[in-house]
Amino acid sequence: MTSGEAAKAFTPAEPFRMVVEEGKIREFARATASPCAEHLASENPVTPLTFLASHRLWMIDDRHSGWHGIHRDFRYLLHGQEEFTFHGPLPVSGTVLTVRQSIERQYEKRGRRGGTMVFTDLVTRFWTESGNEGPPLVEERSVLISTEPPAAGAPAGTSEPARAPVEAVEAVEVVQVVAAPGELVFDTVQPALTITDFVKYQGASGDFNPIHHDTAFAQSSGKPGPFAVGMLAAAVAANQLTAVAGDVPVHRYRVRWSEIAWPGDALRYQGVRTGATSYRIDVTRPDGRNHLTAWADTTG
């Protein structure tokens, strides 16, 4: 058991039905700047690699959330890591999925800058018509970090706690991949981020945390203003990988965040082939600081 981990059992949420709809696929693809024709096809579009992060749109109420009965303050909730593992082909429009979410563990750790961070490992599993028995088609694992409010007397609206997610990933013993020199497979710079981009992604994914679009709410957390949804750049990176990998299925896609991305940042996406079936993607801000790193393993 990890130091500070609470010996607590969590009850899985009730399963719910998710019908993959072609209009939602295209909306998600547009919100994440997908260059892939299969995501925008007029018939049976294929879901983008991170599309299933939108599952919360199909939840009826709190009983379908792994968080049911657990308080969380969205002003101080950070996304440390995300991982998708695929055990079959990506769903196409019309696919009916059974989805069930659960918290596997929750524990505390002292941050390097002081204060207590609470880590939550949230797992969402997706099955096809077989229901929620047997191996899932897709498994999504999220590491969420709840941090403490800024110290009393700290000036509001000025902080940028850029390194907290990195501390979080180290704390849960995620091994950072060190890639050997390899082939650069894409190197692009996207247009400067806007709050409109954040809102489009929030609508497409169902992540409605107001910290990404509401200035007053963001400043109440100690931030200077709204900032990018972490999964936005993760989805853009995944789409660029799909455009390069073509028809080769991805088995695992993992992301960890290092720095917040802000309105006005024109993010640079660099994808490197690190092995016969593996890739690393670095997403950097205009100042050269890393926003996120993603790793992908394909099946061939």
How should each PLM-predicted stretch be described?
Residues 1-81, 153-155, 165-247:
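Hot-dog-fold acyl-thioester-processing enzymes
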Residues 1-3, 81, 85-190, 257-300:
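HotDog/MaoC-like acyl-thioester-processing domains
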Residues 225-228, 232-267, 272-274, 283-286:
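Catalytic-pocket segment enriched in acidic/His residues
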